[in-house]
């Protein structure tokens, strides 16, 4: 176990704004998505048939990047993207996945389909800006994920969780087998007890000091670390 601190929602948003100003969203998203793919490769090396469930915001963008890198790592990813974002960045990320011949599902997979076809489902729906309730475009896929037996890996925040208080309804909240926190763990990670990785190796010492972050050392050239 590596000792680490947590970010509340307001500090997570403020840190992201600073990072965007220094690096730009494209660079950060590429690094974050790569670290997610690397963590999945460490945590689930044999789970080659992966579905990435992509949301409309930055968390979804991380998922698209993650899918592309998983493909290059030898996985067989597929993507379910129920509400596409009409912005150049997301359109380009989608085209990149298509260039790598990653299939996009045209219909919401059933719980039975999630169980029979995939060995891992990556939850890249909502990030730390999420506020309940879940919008109707996403209720079906989240409900199917709630009832699947296939393990789930959530990027940064398990979708539907409160960013600070964790699962609001224990019986109707995702219970991922793995969580990949980005930049720094958010407060809700205190309620997570599975495989926990940290990715996003781009926090400068000055920012760590400003936000009072205690972060683990990344091993060697790795871009993720298990907490």
Swiss-Prot record:
For the YjeF N-terminal domain, which residue ranges apply?
7-215
Cited Gene3D superfamilies: YjeF N-terminal domain (3.40.50.10260)
Question: Which family is this sequence assigned to?
Answer: Belongs to the NnrE/AIBP family.
Keywords in alphabetical order, please. Isomerase, Metal-binding, NAD, NADP, Nucleotide-binding, Potassium
What residue ranges are annotated as transmembrane?
Answer: none
CC terms in the record's Gene Ontology section = mitochondrion
Q: What does this protein do?
A: Catalyzes the epimerization of the S- and R-forms of NAD(P)HX, a damaged form of NAD(P)H that is a result of enzymatic or heat-dependent hydration. This is a prerequisite for the S-specific NAD(P)H-hydrate dehydratase to allow the repair of both epimers of NAD(P)HX.
What's the protein name? NAD(P)H-hydrate epimerase
Cofactor(s) recorded for this entry are: K(+)
* Residues the record lists as binding (6S)-NADPHX: 58-62, 127-133, 156
Record HAMAP family: NADHX_epimerase (MF_01966)
- Under which EC number(s) is this enzyme classified? 5.1.99.6
Enumerate the InterPro entries for this protein: YjeF_N_dom (IPR004443), YjeF_N_dom_sf (IPR036652), YJEFN_prot_NAXE-like (IPR032976)
What does the cofactor section's free text say about binding?
A: Binds 1 potassium ion per subunit.
Q: Which reaction does it catalyse?
A: (6R)-NADHX = (6S)-NADHX; (6R)-NADPHX = (6S)-NADPHX
Q: Which GO terms describe its molecular function?
A: metal ion binding; NAD(P)HX epimerase activity; nucleotide binding
């Amino acid at each position: 176990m590596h000792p680490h601190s947590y970010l509340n929602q307001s500090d997570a948003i403020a840190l992201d704004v600073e990072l965007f100003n220094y690096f730009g969203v494209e660079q950060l998203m590429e690094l974050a998505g790569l670290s997610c793919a690397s963590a999945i490769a460490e945590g689930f090396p044999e789970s080659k048939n992966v579905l990435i469930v992509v949301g409309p915001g930055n968390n979804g963008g991380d998922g698209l990047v993650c899918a592309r890198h998983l493909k290059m790592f030898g996985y067989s990813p597929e993507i379910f993207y129920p509400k596409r974002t009409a912005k150049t960045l997301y359109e380009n990320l989608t085209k990149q996945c298509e260039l790598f011949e990653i299939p996009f599902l045209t219909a919401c997979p059933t719980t039975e389909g999630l169980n029979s076809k995939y060995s891992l489902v990556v939850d890249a729906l909502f990030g730390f800006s999420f506020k309940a309730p879940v919008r109707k475009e996403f209720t079906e896929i989240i409900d199917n994920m709630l009832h699947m037996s296939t393990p789930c890996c959530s990027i940064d925040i398990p979708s539907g969780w409160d960013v600070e208080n964790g699962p609001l309804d224990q019986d109707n909240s995702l219970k991922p087998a793995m969580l990949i926190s980005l930049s720094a763990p958010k407060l809700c990670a205190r309620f997570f007890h599975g495989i926990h990785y940290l990715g996003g190796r781009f926090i400068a010492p000055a920012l760590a000091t400003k936000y009072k972050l205690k972060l683990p050392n990344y091993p060697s050239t790795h871009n993720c670390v298990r907490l």
